[in-house]
């Protein structure tokens, strides 16, 4: 259970960090976001998902090795 809770916490941290980043970008760079709104958000989400998957895979490998 401890490993799962750690995994969920890492995912939560990533999601909250990306949400904060998007909010900051939208407030500071209005012109960029008006021109390429969808593309930038999609790229950010894809990068976030890849990083989350890598973290989960690494955590699962560590758990398997410990057993």
From Swiss-Prot:
Main location: membrane
Record's protein name: Putative uncharacterized transmembrane protein DDB_G0280899
Intracellular or extracellular location(s): Membrane
GO cellular component: membrane
Keywords in alphabetical order: Membrane, Transmembrane, Transmembrane helix
Highest taxon listed in the record's lineage: Eukaryota
Residues annotated as transmembrane: 6-26, 38-58
UniProt topology in membrane: Multi-pass membrane protein
């Amino acid at each position: 259970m401890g490993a799962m809770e750690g995994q969920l916490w890492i995912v939560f941290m990533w999601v909250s960090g990306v949400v904060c980043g998007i909010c900051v970008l939208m407030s500071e760079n209005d012109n960029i976001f008006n021109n390429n709104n969808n593309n930038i958000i999609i790229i950010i989400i894809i990068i976030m998902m890849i990083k989350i998957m890598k973290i989960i895979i690494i955590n699962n490998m560590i758990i398997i090795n410990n057993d």
